[in-house]
Amino acid sequence: MILLEVNNRIIEEILTLKFENAAAGNKPEAVEVTFADFDGVLYHVSNPNGDKAKVLISISLKFYKELQEHGTDEVLKKVYGNFLVAPESGYNVSLLYDLESLPSNKDSVIHQAGMLKRNCFASVFEKYFKFQEEGKDGEKRAVIHYRDDETMYVEAKKDRVTVVFSTVFKDDDDVVIGKVFMQEFKEGRRASHTAPQVLFSHREPPLELKDTDAAVGDNIGYITFVLFPRHTNANARDNTINLIHTFRDYLHYHIKCSKAYIHTRMRAKTSDFLKVLNRARPDAEKKEMKTITGKTFAAR
């Protein structure tokens, strides 16, 4: 299986190029790039007020207000410090980099810029991991509508943190492949006792969402992760956040890859069958044609 990159490579490549050119004393060039990421996220990289010596990176998330309720602003201030500036119009978060004053830890700065989307998500998980660590129970469940018709729920207990993703399958085939895919996670837990418990429910929400307005339908699926202290402690939580916040994209990416692989195999088999049929086809019987004098026509 393929793990999707947590960081945004486009941002990292742009900043790396800008920092290297600035360090070499080259004349700065203009940049104006707008691009999308998973979950409807939009990025904009530009020169503020046309100043080529400065690079502004902005991100737009439709669900940012819900993240703010769980301390995203504070987490971003902690991670980005002075690079964090007032957000550009139409965006939620902006980072400003001055090419005339390069940081000493350029590699770390570039990496964190590429992790902007992940760091926006992180506050929700960090908050509930801390609730579990402190033994708090009964805290209000976090509800993040990370896509127009899909939702993430996070809830903390004294001994665990439960994360539930709702997802919509566009085709009936996706449901079948999704079920097979999720079965692999169950098999994986048998092989590794340190893996989190993963549950999948189709049509109906899990018991954790019993009294909520969680969607119900033939094309709705719910993936539940049960995270224990070994997954949420200070040493493991960063990696847990990296993996779990991209899980929905990871699932649908592999569903599409599986369908593409099946279609490729089907086309290859069809081609093989056609070759067999062509070899088995009997040759057409040649009809001998003669003239009135009895001579035979010969093809030239």
Curated annotation (Swiss-Prot):
User: A single GO molecular function, which one?
Assistant: actin filament binding
One annotated Gene Ontology cellular component of this protein: cell projection
Subunit comment: Component of the Arp2/3 complex composed of actr2/arp2, actr3/arp3, arpc1 (arpc1a or arpc1b), arpc2, arpc3, arpc4 and arpc5.
Q: What does this protein do?
A: Actin-binding component of the Arp2/3 complex, a multiprotein complex that mediates actin polymerization upon stimulation by nucleation-promoting factor (NPF). The Arp2/3 complex mediates the formation of branched actin networks in the cytoplasm, providing the force for cell motility. In addition to its role in the cytoplasmic cytoskeleton, the Arp2/3 complex also promotes actin polymerization in the nucleus, thereby regulating gene transcription and repair of damaged DNA.
**Major location (coarse):** cytoplasm
Its subcellular locations are: Cytoplasm, Cytoskeleton; Cell projection; Nucleus
Q: Tell me the keywords, alphabetical order.
A: Actin-binding, Cell projection, Cytoplasm, Cytoskeleton, Nucleus
Biological processes annotated in GO: actin filament polymerization; Arp2/3 complex-mediated actin nucleation
User: Known InterPro entries for this protein?
Assistant: ARPC2, ARPC2/4
Q: Which family does it belong to?
A: Belongs to the ARPC2 family.
- Protein name (Swiss-Prot/TrEMBL): Actin-related protein 2/3 complex subunit 2-A
Write down the species: Xenopus laevis (African clawed frog)
The protein's superkingdom reads Eukaryota
Cite the Pfam families for this sequence: P34-Arc (PF04045)
Database matches in Gene3D superfamilies: 3.30.1460.20
